[in-house]
Amino acid sequence: MNDIQKSDFSSKSDNCGISKTGAEHDGFGWDLHCHSSFSDGTCSPAELVEKAAQIGLSGVAITDHDTTAGWQQAAAAAQKLNFPLIRGTEITSHFGRVSVHILAWLYDPQNEAICALFDNLTKMRKERILLMTDKISKDYPIDREAVFACMKSGDETTPGRPHIADALVAAGVCENRSQAFAGIISPKSPYYVPASSPDAVQVIKAVKNACGAVGIAHSGAICSRGPVLSEEQIEELADAGLDALEIFHRDNPEEQRIRLKKIAGRLNLLATAGSDWHGKGKINRMGENASDSETVREIVKRSFLTVAGM
């Protein structure tokens, strides 16, 4: 995965908002949190990179859930456009009763512990989605095949609730993903199956063992994602090797950003920014929150993989 392979990707105009011609990027920041069709995004990795270049980002990170499957396509597109790419993953975990999504950047993807971790997470994800789909299918016109059909990258797609949501939309049950998440597949729904995940300390140590940098995604999303980590819990994760907190994210209210800035300052953690872009899968706009080059250089310094121009 270290070597970028050439691709025959050709740009096109589609629902990812990409035009047929390229655009010079003037470098207004780095979006360190974006998803492709290899998890729950709607655009291919190549389209993700091309859009980042066209809107003027300095660079972009591909951070699909629990997989590196989209890295090669993204890297090929980045090389073709001479555009800086950060290869990463958003890893599902928990710490106590808090759901913790860990942004892992620029680690060795061939590390045995990382590979085993992703294999286990994929297995747990598939089991959960099948259980939820079977429960929903008793009352609504969707089945496993309909959900699988919504996984745009086939067997390499990391399965998740968004794919059930897409199947419900395709069946005319829901108008969009947001409606599905607010109702049929919400945690309060009788069809909901809780996610299984590894402990956050275990995940952080695995990424650090693979020589990557580690951040906590949407670390102050108290309104939309349930309980958030306390200062004491963040300190424990910092002791395990945590490098950063994603402070600038649309789900973090201002009071949480203020709290997290103070914690990051005390613990000497990096403050990162990301859009959590999913193409048409969310309203989030790529680049709406962007990290500066100094922060990215520090991430690269701590990591196994390199980034062009850094």
Please tell me what each predicted stretch does:
Residues N268-T272, G279-F304:
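C-terminal active-site subregion of NodB/CE4 polysaccharide deacetylases
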Residues D14, T21, A77-E235, A290, ...:
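Extended substrate/RNA-proximal surfaces in nucleic-acid metabolism proteins
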Residues M1-V98, I185-S186, P198, Q202-K282, ...:
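An N-terminally biased module of ancient metal coordination in phosphate/nucleic-acid-related enzymes
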